Amino acid sequence: MDLCRNRFPYQFHTVDRENPVAEAVAVRDGKFLEVGTVAEVMQHHCEGTKVVDLKGHTAIPGLNDSHLHLIRGGLNYNLELRWEGVPSLADALRMLKEQALRTPSPQWVRVVGGWTEFQFAERRMPTLDEINDAAPDTPVFILHLYDRALLNRAALKVVGYTKDTPNPPGGEIQRDANGNPTGMLIARPNAMILYATLAKGPKLPLEQQVNSTRQFMRELNRLGLTSAIDAGGGFQNYPEDYEVIAELHEKKQ
């Protein structure tokens, strides 16, 4: 059994209208045994009980995300380079170059959203030339919101987009004056071209998919999420892409 208490009163928010805040909680086998004052909770103290002092931090009930691409995000989490919070485009391009150097073939470098040009000091997106200079040989896929993606020359080669490739029904391949793909994919009229292109990248072996999904879930836990509804989509397949969840559940991870 675990007992959690706080040196300051009323730091547990319960979302219970009749008992909205509490000083301490007792948990046994993953379920709340008591929610109330320190005195009430400490009545459950016995040999082997783990006591956790939150030291003034606030605890809230776990959050549920009703629309999350848990499977897709988990399968690719360890493959992604994340630009959220990066202060400058120069820093982002440096990170891209470093990631490309340590990415083994045939894997790609993937920046799957989570950033905007307005976070950068330069207040602009990277150019295709800058991306090609940072990663001349390793395929790179950079998703910008849901409106476009940037691919370097190496990525265009492995996905097979050429002058003769027609635009798919769900998107547009931007081309230069000679009709050759530039590396920009435009989500017009929808984002299908972005999903379809990202799905062409190589997958991790099952063991590494399990590790990647576990890491993704721990990150969600860090942000306060304890449950989610998987929204599917994005070219993941049932049941094979859901094997990781079954394995993590079996291992209680």
Residue positions per predicted region:
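Divalent metal-binding segments
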Residues: 2-8, 13, 17-62, 66-253
